């Protein structure tokens, strides 16, 4: 059975994007599989492509307790990048738990992968666990798109997700760093963050973020607050139109009063007013003789 990475992110020609040819399958199997070895923990480094940036210490402690009781059932997966130097491909939480237990060595499977393959496996392995924050997931999608030169639609097909899911996650990356940090720290939810996107103005986004955290606003309250701000930001055209109409009335009344004063002085003045869509027209006839 072909492994998920080979099937979804193979490096063959376009006809084999989703499945590698049978001839190359055995080579891939030989390439990615080695027997389990005990590797000194001091010789192992975390994966530089690890999408997870926040590790819950309490959960690592729980995992360490489980490993102490039952042993490490699933070895970590690493690749060798220098003599006696290894990089984690999958299993960083297990590695951290083993470190907390004071282990000197940890069981590991060594796979011979290049940088692109290592990054892809690490990203996909974490995405499949569905334990990433929304921002970590978005970063993982972005890295896969860049590594394999994919469109959002192509990535969605390979991961079995809707394109809108990918697009919504990637939009989060355009938010200010403070909001992304709040998402990572789980101070706000993904829906809170997505509600902030229409504001556009970074200063306003951060102001609302502060309100969400300080007032513990739920998603509905946040959306209502943002809708109000967006409404307030709209040009007040109606008010402007009323101001223009008022000025026009003042002008018309001033002209009428002036004509009335001329008439009262004994001069017979004829005037005619016409109203059009865009303007008023006043025609005044003043006799040359009384």
From Swiss-Prot:
GO cellular component: chromosome; cytoplasm; nucleoid
Keyword vocabulary terms for this entry: Cell cycle, Cell division, Cytoplasm, DNA-binding, Septation
Coiled coil feature spans: none
GO BP annotation list: chromosome segregation; division septum assembly; positive regulation of sporulation resulting in formation of a cellular spore
rRNA-binding as UniProt keyword: no
Main subcellular location: cytoplasm
DNA-binding region: 153-172
Gene3D superfamilies linked to this entry: 1.10.10.2830, 3.90.1530.30
Localisation: Cytoplasm, Nucleoid
InterPro entries given in the database record: Chromosome_partition/occlusion (IPR050336), HTH_ParB/Spo0J (IPR041468), Nucleoid_occlusion_protein (IPR023705), ParB/RepB/Spo0J (IPR004437), ParB/Sulfiredoxin_dom (IPR003115), ParB/Sulfiredoxin_sf (IPR036086)
GO MF annotations, alphabetized: DNA binding
NCBIfam families: nucleoid_noc, parB_part
PANTHER family cross-referenced by the UniProt entry: CHROMOSOME-PARTITIONING PROTEIN PARB-RELATED (PTHR33375), NUCLEOID OCCLUSION PROTEIN (PTHR33375:SF8)
Family assignment from sequence similarity: Belongs to the ParB family.
Stated role: Effects nucleoid occlusion by binding relatively nonspecifically to DNA and preventing the assembly of the division machinery in the vicinity of the nucleoid, especially under conditions that disturb the cell cycle. It helps to coordinate cell division and chromosome segregation by preventing the formation of the Z ring through the nucleoid, which would cause chromosome breakage.
Protein name: Nucleoid occlusion protein
Source species of the chain: Bacillus cereus (strain ATCC 14579 / DSM 31 / CCUG 7414 / JCM 2152 / NBRC 15305 / NCIMB 9373 / NCTC 2599 / NRRL B-3711)
């Amino acid at each position: 059975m072909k492994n998920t990475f080979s099937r979804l992110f193979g490096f063959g020609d376009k006809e084999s994007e989703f499945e590698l040819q049978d001839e190359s399958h055995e080579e891939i199997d030989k390439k990615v599989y080695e027997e389990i070895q005990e590797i000194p923990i001091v010789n192992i480094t975390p994966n530089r492509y690890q999408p997870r940036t926040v590790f819950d210490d309490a959960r690592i402690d729980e995992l360490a307790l489980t490993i102490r009781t039952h042993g490490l059932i699933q070895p970590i997966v690493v690749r060798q990048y220098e003599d006696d130097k290894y990089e984690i491909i999958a299993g960083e939480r297990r590695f951290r738990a083993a470190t907390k237990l004071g282990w000197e060595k940890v069981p590991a499977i060594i796979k011979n992968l290049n940088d692109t393959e290592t990054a892809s496996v690490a990203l996909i392995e974490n995405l499949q666990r569905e334990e990433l924050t929304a921002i970590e997931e978005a970063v993982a999608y972005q890295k896969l798109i860049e590594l394999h030169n994919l469109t959002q639609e192509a990535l969605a097909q390979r991961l079995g997700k809707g394109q809108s899911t990918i697009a919504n996650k990637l939009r989060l990356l355009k938010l200010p760093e403070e909001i992304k940090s709040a998402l990572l720290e789980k101070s706000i939810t993904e829906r809170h963050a997505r509600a902030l996107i229409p504001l556009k103005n970074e200063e306003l986004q951060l102001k609302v973020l502060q309100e969400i955290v300080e007032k513990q606003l739920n998603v509905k309250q946040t959306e209502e607050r943002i809708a109000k701000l967006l409404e307030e930001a709209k040009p007040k055209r109606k008010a402007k139109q009323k101001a223009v109409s008022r000025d026009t009335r003042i002008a018309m009344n001033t002209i009428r009063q002036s004509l009335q004063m001329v008439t009262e002085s004994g001069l017979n003045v004829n005037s005619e007013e016409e109203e059009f869509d865009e303007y008023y027209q006043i025609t005044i006839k003043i006799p040359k003789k009384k």
